[in-house]
Every structure is written in C-alpha cells, then in structure tokens.
C-alpha cells in the first residue's frame, strides 16, 4: 500500500512520528516521507539519528519546517503527497489549559488546514490521530481533539 508513495507526517519529529517513520522505512519501499514539524532542532536531530539507523534510506526523508496553523505553508508541503498522517497537536493537558488560544489554533484550526490542503492537493487519504481524552472530554485538550475528530469525520 505504501510502496512508491509519498507520505507527509505532521508532528513528524514527535514520538509517534519518529516511530511511524521507522516502521515505514523498515517495512515499505516508499518514494518519500516528508517530516513536517515546526522544530528545527528536532528535525536536525532526527535526520542525524536516521543517517545512522538508515544510511541507505535517509535520502527518502525530506525535512519540511512548518506549522499546521499556516495553511499556505502546509499546502506547499502537500504537493505530490499521496497520504497524510496527522500527528501534530498541542497535547500536554496543562499546556492546553494555560494556553487555550494556542490549543485551539493548533488542534482545531490546524485540523481544518489539514482537511483543506488535502482536498485542494488531491491527497488520497488522511489518517488523523486522536486520543481517549476526546471521549467525554473533561479538559481543553480532550475538547479540542473531539472537535478535530468531528471535523475529519465531516470531511469524509
């Protein structure tokens, strides 16, 4: 399914993004994996780690600095992409509680940007990660992820 495909991973330098990228490189012969994140240092660190772990495959990785809150930048990253794995989120419960505007911008507006870019760029499939905290949410993180889930479902 993923052989010879281009995959974009939002939050690609996070714990899920790194594990997913390793799994894909271990099991598929992808055309390209775009690691999309806003943290330049984490991208640099991940690239160096993957040069050691996957010296013959690191050329398939592209490190794209950007934020899911920036629709124009994200659309640029989506050119030629077959699949998006959306793992970017503001996910620490206390950080969301103390920074509600940032949580909404990233987790809800970011989801809307993923959907719009995927539709505009003819992306074949989007897989959006969620959390158990979106079921009967009791905090802002759960609430923003519930809204994000509803947006992705409505876009089907």
Label every PLM stretch briefly.
Residues 56, 62-83:
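Conserved Rossmann-fold cofactor-binding substructure of NAD(P)-dependent oxidoreductases
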Residues 5-27:
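N-terminal Rossmann NAD(P)H-binding glycine-rich loop of SDR-like oxidoreductase domains
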Residues 83-86, 90-150, 154-156:
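Conserved Rossmann-fold NAD(P)-dependent oxidoreductase catalytic core, especially the SDR/UDP-sugar
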């Amino acid at each position: 399914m993923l052989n010879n495909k281009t995959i974009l991973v939002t939050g690609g330098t996070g714990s899920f993004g790194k594990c997913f990228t390793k799994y894909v490189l271990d099991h598929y012969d992808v055309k390209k994996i775009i690691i999309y994140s806003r943290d330049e240092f984490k991208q640099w660190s991940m690239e160096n780690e993957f040069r050691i772990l996957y010296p013959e495959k690191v050329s398939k990785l592209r490190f794209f600095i950007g934020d899911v809150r920036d629709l124009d930048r994200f659309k640029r990253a989506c050119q030629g992409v077959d699949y998006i794995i959306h793992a970017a989120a503001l996910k620490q419960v206390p950080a969301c509680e103390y920074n509600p505007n940032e949580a909404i911008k990233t987790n809800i507006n970011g989801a809307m940007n993923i959907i719009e870019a995927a539709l505009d760029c003819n992306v074949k499939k989007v897989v959006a990660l969620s959390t158990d905290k979106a079921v009967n949410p009791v905090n802002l993180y759960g609430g923003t992820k519930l809204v994000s889930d509803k947006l992705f479902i409505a876009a089907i």
